């Protein structure tokens, strides 16, 4: 139902107009504009996947080039901003809530420390991107994209005016979205709402947006179904992954895996067990790029494993979030990464010339945050 609800946000053009308004206001101050734009994608991707914004890539590239920057900055605003929101996962329904439910944790629990992680990663990521942008603005030859002109016509087909003004209707759409998300978080933390309750809120969100957009019942239903179709693959992967998990459990294979991993993690110094679990999830993500699929396969294993070695289950879920999320922005098998790079006309090899240092920084920052989570006994067991 989340896909169906957010379909109305996309159809309304509210996010597109909001971005265009911000760009027009701060276009002469790169150090302000870039963090503002990445923050938009960070906040939205706390609840949605980055692949939602594949169509945004051409316009962000145009914006970057208009400011004397390169296409990497344009796609980086989407990818890096979205990476922080998705990977820390304070409100993510396809990863965090799935993992917490499998781990036996209250939905959206631990949101306070997750928001701290989000802010830390956001600051580090924006510093990296702004420094890069200012460097290549001063000396364009330092850009990995220097001299690459293939496919630039595709990016120039759109402009800011294509998104239209920020109307009262579009503002109402964004208010409805924010209000529904706040209700979901509040209900989960206060009343212990589960996945069925979340689904009901998404339905109400869709209904209110359809009324705001003055859609006919038939049109609203068609749009809702079209949005749900985008989530079918993720839902199918979760079902298959849960089936695999059930087979592993029934055959007592999962017990053997947990026992073996416990020996590995026990050999690691106690203070580094959280980072070790983070690294394990990074490796697993190479083979299972779906966040919900990885949650369904990994959490039934790492949750009892965390109990064995004395790490809270909340820390194990956070290690899964970060390990699954950040790795997606270097893997050529990631649909979100390759889709946005393709739309922005940025070759994968040139993206990696820019990205590899930031990924190493993410690994270090993530490891430090895992150590802190372990030290404070993060969240309920």
PLM ranges: what are they?
Residues 1-7, 40-42, 85, 116-130, ...:
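Hydrophobic core segments of alpha-helical transmembrane domains in multi-pass membrane transport
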Residues 28-59, 239-243, 248, 264-304, ...:
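Hydrophobic alpha-helical transmembrane segments of multi-pass integral membrane proteins
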Residues 1-16, 193-256:
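Core transmembrane alpha-helical segments of multi-pass membrane transporters/permeases
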Residues 30-45, 69-87, 110, 119, ...:
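Alpha-helical transmembrane segments of multi-pass membrane proteins
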Residues 111-223, 353, 375-381:
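Long, contiguous bundles of hydrophobic transmembrane helices that form the permeation core
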Residues 89-116, 308-315, 335-381:
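Transmembrane alpha-helical segments and their short flanking loops
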Residues 19-20, 52-63, 93-103, 292-305, ...:
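Re-entrant/interfacial helical elements at transmembrane boundaries that shape
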Residues 49, 55, 70-102, 113-152:
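Transmembrane-helix bundle segments that line or gate the permeation/cavity pathway
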